[in-house]
């Protein structure tokens, strides 16, 4: 299922003294099965764009097409519920939204709200808990007895229990330690690769974009200022620094080598790419002797 934006503007509190325009002429396509990262400073419009992905808000101008459903400023708010099932959003610190007495009941809440039987909802809860890497023994535990990382996995399982086609992640690793962040990002990568799930990642961590995304969109003041494959967008390291977006760690290290006379065919963005290019250079140097 593709999601397409066509000439989308969005304004908060239009026609009031508090009017604030958040998005300007957004044109983009999030392709079915893709892994798209959205980056930009606080206030760049990332969260507003994110809320258009499952019609939590409607465009002030233009249209958003979600699968076969076209959302315009005139779209009735009724019957938008099916979209929320197709596009699941995991907001920052989703564990704050846990509320049920047991993990099972929390995960099953969404499906039951969409008419799934109690028995089927319990099956989904067990399946999704396994999918996020937690043992079924936790099903009857209170979610509030779990660690912070486990609580976040339970909250994500609750979104996955809706069986969405698109999973939208708003800073999903915020507050996690490096090990927890790595495990979480690998989990999303498995969902993408093994279940062909479309992933949209909002993040400020350029290493995660370089390691996992196949497309990146850069927002600034409500406008798209760059879009393309990470390997293309992140080659412009000076531009990234000027925009204070940060540079992937491997690219930053590679630039230091370049400053000392080393050359790369293409600036590596990940540790694997850096290692591969260094090994190739060493082999070439060995053959030249």
From Swiss-Prot:
Membrane topology label: Peripheral membrane protein
Broad enzyme group: translocase
Keyword ATP-binding carried by entry: yes
GO-annotated molecular function: ATP binding; ATP hydrolysis activity; ATPase-coupled transmembrane transporter activity
Compartments, record wording: Cell membrane
Entries under Gene3D superfamilies matching the protein: P-loop containing nucleotide triphosphate hydrolases
Entry superkingdom: Bacteria
Protein name per UniProt: Energy-coupling factor transporter ATP-binding protein EcfA2
């Amino acid at each position: 299922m593709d999601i397409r934006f066509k000439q989308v503007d969005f304004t908060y509190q239009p026609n009031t003294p508090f009017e604030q325009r958040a998005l300007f002429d957004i044109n983009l396509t999030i392709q079915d099965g893709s892994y798209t990262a959205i980056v930009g400073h606080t206030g760049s419009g990332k969260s507003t764009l994110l809320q258009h992905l499952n019609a939590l808000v409607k465009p002030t101008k233009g249209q958003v097409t979600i699968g076969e459903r076209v959302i315009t400023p005139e779209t009735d708010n009724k019957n938008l519920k099916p979209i929320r099932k197709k596009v699941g959003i995991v907001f920052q610190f989703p564990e704050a939204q846990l509320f049920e007495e047991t993990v099972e009941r929390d995960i099953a809440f969404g499906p039951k709200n969409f008419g799934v039987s109690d028995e089927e909802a319990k099956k989904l809860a067990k399946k999704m808990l396994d999918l996020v890497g937690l043992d079924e023994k936790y099903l009857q535990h209170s979610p509030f007895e779990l660690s912070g990382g486990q609580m976040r996995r339970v909250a994500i399982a609750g979104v996955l229990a809706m069986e969405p086609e698109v999973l939208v992640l708003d800073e999903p690793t915020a507050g996690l330690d490096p090990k927890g962040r790595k495990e979480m990002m690998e989990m999303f990568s498995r969902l993408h690769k093994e279940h062909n799930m479309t992933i949209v990642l909002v993040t400020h961590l350029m290493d995660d974009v370089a390691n996992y995304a196949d497309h990146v969109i850069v927002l600034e003041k409500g406008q798209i200022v760059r879009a393309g494959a990470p390997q293309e967008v992140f080659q412009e390291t000076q531009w990234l620094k000027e925009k204070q977006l940060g540079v992937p760690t491997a690219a930053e290290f590679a630039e230091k080598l370049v400053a000392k006379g080393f050359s790369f065919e293409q600036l590596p963005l990940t540790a694997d790419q850096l290692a591969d290019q260094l090994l190739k250079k060493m082999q070439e140097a060995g053959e030249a002797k």
